[in-house]
Amino acid sequence: MFYTETYDVIVIGGGHAGTEAALAPARMGFKTLLLTHNVDTLGQMSCNPAIGGIGKGHLVKEVDAMGGLMAHAADKAGIQFRTLNSSKGPAVRATRAQADRVLYRQAVRTALENQPNLDIFQQEATDILIEQDRVTGVSTKMGLIFRAKSVVLTAGTFLAGKIHIGLENYEGGRAGDPASVNLSHRLRDLGLRVDRLKTGTPPRIDARTINFDILAKQHGDEVLPMFSFMGSVDDHPQQIPCYITYTNEQTHEVIRNNLDRSPMYTGVIEGIGPRYCPSIEDKVMRFSDRNSHQIYLEPEGLTSNEVYPNGISTSLPFDVQMGIVNSMKGLENARIVKPGYAIEYDYFDPRDLKPTLETKSISGLFFAGQINGTTGYEEAAAQGLLAGINAGLYVQEKDAWYPRRDQSYTGVLVDDLCTLGTKEPYRVFTSRAEYRLLLREDNADIRLTPIAHELGLIDDARWARFNQKMENIEQERQRLRNIWLHPRSEYLEEANKVLGSPLVREASGEDLLRRPEMTYDILTSLTPYKPAMEDKEAVEQVEIAIKYQGYIEHQQEEIEKQKRHENTAIPANFDYSKVSSLSNEVRAKLEQHRPVSISQASRISGITPAAISIILVNLKKQGMLKRGE
């Protein structure tokens, strides 16, 4: 049976990738349908109740800069905010928030239900309809057929999901939700490369059974940060602390004595788990020299008694989980309300995707989130936004868009996935970005909001606020450039009190601000440079731009060199078999990856500079050597 409406874009899945993937084309004016197996779990935080962190906070800011939802929802739901690496340089500072699960889900659902051009329908998708290698729609469990010109699949851990607790296992997409078995079989039939990954979650503990009085308390920042560039401190709900405990030798002994009941250590689980979020049994065995591990007790919400013990993800049997929990300080009498578990699921090789997240073999079909081998809400949201944008552009047969590595962490994420693939759950770190001084949290809007405006992703209010900020930055920099202090100035004595070394020649406000001991606040406390600007975001940009000017200019020079290769496109129909001077190994890798540019080809493992030169020569010979704008 055909549904009465025909859509431009259908998004399958209502998690963090799916919600962003649905909102983006709807904001661009495309008629969009979000298909979910349960409308009550839209925006569900399936694992840890937190948003952001190192690298991840950068992604949240980027999603927000392009009109996405995650930052707004995190501001509405955040019950503890912290700026990580606050004592380090601006490139690695990152925002993190503990979130109230209920408030977060409410913020997501409210945004979805009030978005024009977006419909929501509760049904399990069981088949993706394809004609002549082109997607035409989706069919559901009840036999309903939805027609669309493009489809974004954001299935999370649901594709052939299998939950493990001890040596027992059963089908499931997450605790309490069924797996998508039929859809998994259908995707395997399409000939896409598929493998299995694994992730896990810890048991949840009843807060009423924890002795918080003997535990260390961790408060959030006193000056509360915000995720959204349009946010306000007034958006934040009540702030509450987290607590800290530790595993000990007794904990580790419980784990070691029960490894024969672990699905990981008995070979029942074959999927590879996240390297940077290992299970507690993995930590105990891999770091056998350590006699304790720090565990954060994170509240799940203002109205919930559930506590998330961050650091003891496990798939051991329930009785062993009880032994682990009760062995720790403050948790001697703690009660588990939800057991921890591991989940195995299908993911598809992201090297079979274009950088737009469209599959190379099926036109109009896009993948986003854990289906591409990533882990984390933030990585999923960034991919969902990108896939949703390009699903809309595909409908209009417009040029696709994707960010470069020098433009955003989303660009780094997508390039890593599509060029190198992954054999383990991939997460973003600042260390993955070679241009991280330019890819800071604080300038995500400067990097991406103009692009979002061109794509139709942001409203007039955001665009006006952005332009006002840019105007404030330029005006303040101009003001500081034009105010000079010289050794004969009547204000010299005042200035020398705060300068590390006395002023011996004239200097502008910008010159003074470049000094290591000088800050914007100190500078604008001096009489010649009063008053300070009220726009704190603009102040931050002024200070960073001036203090790091040399480093920033150096990175920009490197980027310009790299762009020459990035803009040298390799046509999709380029025949590597006709390039006789390439080795068989190199030719096979290029045929497998089908890079879209010389730059992407150069990042494939085993592709040498000599091979790149050969490709360039052959592109020129065949009249295919074209450079992008």
UniProtKB/Swiss-Prot annotation:
For this UniProt record, the keywords arranged alphabetically read as follows: Cytoplasm, FAD, Flavoprotein, NAD, tRNA processing
Give cofactor(s), names only. FAD
Q: Which GO terms describe its molecular function?
A: flavin adenine dinucleotide binding
Please tell me where NAD(+) binds in this chain: 273-287
Query: Which domain of life, per UniProt?
Result: Bacteria
**According to its UniProt record, where is this protein mainly located?**
cytoplasm
Q: What is this protein called?
A: tRNA uridine 5-carboxymethylaminomethyl modification enzyme MnmG
Give the originating organism. Haemophilus influenzae (strain PittEE)
